[in-house]
Amino acid sequence: MKRAKSIEKRQEKALAQKEGLLKNIEKADELRITPLPWRGRLLAEARELSISYGKPLFEGLSFFLEEGDRAALTGPNGCGKSSILRLLVGEEVPHTGMLSRGRGLIVSYVPQDASFLSGTVQDYALREGIDRSLFFTILRKFDFPRSQFEKDMAGYSGGQKKKVLLARSLCERAHLYIWDEPLNFIDLLSRVQIERLLGTASPAMLFVEHDRRFVEQTANKVIALRTQPPAETGKDPLPANG
């Protein structure tokens, strides 16, 4: 009997917390993003792409990204998802096959690892060439404490560092947004804000995220990466070879 009452109390407490969170979400100032319009149809394309670090992570991947795509790159850990994103933003990644971007394509990239951040957010805004006022406004919408603005980012929590990277990306006007595990260490309120933003603004995006609900709510295209064979699916199935 006592155990049943204890369980009931925990359930009531969890329900109250959820209701309170939903009220906070409704009151929260909405995030905004201003993507650049793309002049053509094709943003990026991969054909027979293979990535190998001594041994192949995957082979023969083909896909394309178009204006309006919010594509989730999915697959098991270590299968090469982050390597594809890094290759697409111009980093050196050992590969064969073709991965091309539209000429003049502007990309905004949020890497998975934020440990490199250091200095104050003011210094960071200056280095990145973004509007400091807008940057700070977005951080505050993420419930980022003002007291942190003057502190060294090296001492930030993982969630605070990820919010810095996301806020910087939201400040940037780009044709394509590439985000690697954007929800890592992020609180629930900020997660819902991001989900709502992407559902209403619909920027062209390629992202990696292990949160299945976020993928289901956000993506209109899924590139499923497997070692053998790669495949592409989506709400409107498209040929994998473009």
Where are these regions (language model features)?
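ABC ATP-binding cassette signature C-motif
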Residues: W38-G242
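Coupling and communication elements adjacent to P-loop NTPase active sites across diverse families
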Residues: M1-G54, E66
